[in-house]
């Protein structure tokens, strides 16, 4: 069993190149996999490993980056290691939006999962899913709307169209995208902006299914693909043709072929591409029979 730990922290960081090397070396030493993104504005990461190794790694990360606690964190379990390798990346922003976040100037507008239902049940509240469309399609909250933007940098264009007097309840996977979006709205003069504390993952971990207003599963950016209530690994897999999530229902379509295509990409792939993907899948299947992992195998479950 592996622990999966997601976290972020907005704090001015320096010596990024030096810290990248220190972090990378320690991840390798402790056999921790996943991705850590560092920028001048802070850190955003999801990493996974055995419990004791992960615990010491978390302590080491705080020491290297010089802070005592994270702004937000979540932990879940996985029967398999959901990441291929350890990666530490230096970026201009931990979440690309063209907006630098200063936590000192930010209001405390986080809504606890236990109070979230009451807020989004209010018909006057705009329930805003700040994730990408394909994530929204896997699962979302009751009454939510999605901006339908290709990347987060386009999000401000959508936000500019909203009424400043309308209460807005935003949510995303772990909370970090909403941190930036809420700062943007506050700077634009919006007064009633709220965000789900700890994001969807925190909600699914703490709210029982019978009390939940969440429909579907939550897409995650690792080889679990999706999680359900209790942060149990979900039922989705990933299409090798287009890298979009595929549900058990999608797999019943004639357009679905394991390792080749799904309902999202079948009509857009050329015959040459499909033949290439079939050959790749054949190699993966042969590797599985011998108990080894093929270089092109993207999923572990």
Swiss-Prot record:
What is annotated as the active site?
172 (cysteine persulfide intermediate)
Q: Which Gene3D superfamilies match?
A: 3.30.70.100, Rhodanese-like domain (3.40.250.10)
Keywords (A to Z) from UniProt: Oxidoreductase, tRNA processing
KW tRNA processing (keyword) present: yes
Catalytic reactions on record:
uridine(34) in tRNA + AH2 + O2 = 5-hydroxyuridine(34) in tRNA + A + H2O
Biological process according to GO: tRNA modification
**Rhodanese domain ranges (all copies):** 121-212
| CDD domains in the record | RHOD_YceA (cd01518)
EC number, UniProt record: 1.14.-.-
Q: Which molecular-function annotation in GO is an example for this chain?
A: oxidoreductase activity, acting on paired donors, with incorporation or reduction of molecular oxygen
The cross-references to InterPro entries, in alphabetical order and at most eight, read:
Rhodanese-like_dom (IPR001763), Rhodanese-like_dom_sf (IPR036873), TrhO (IPR020936), TRHO_N (IPR040503)
Function recorded in the entry: Catalyzes oxygen-dependent 5-hydroxyuridine (ho5U) modification at position 34 in tRNAs.
The family note in this entry says: Belongs to the TrhO family.
Q: Any idea what this protein is called?
A: tRNA uridine(34) hydroxylase
| Protein's gene | trhO
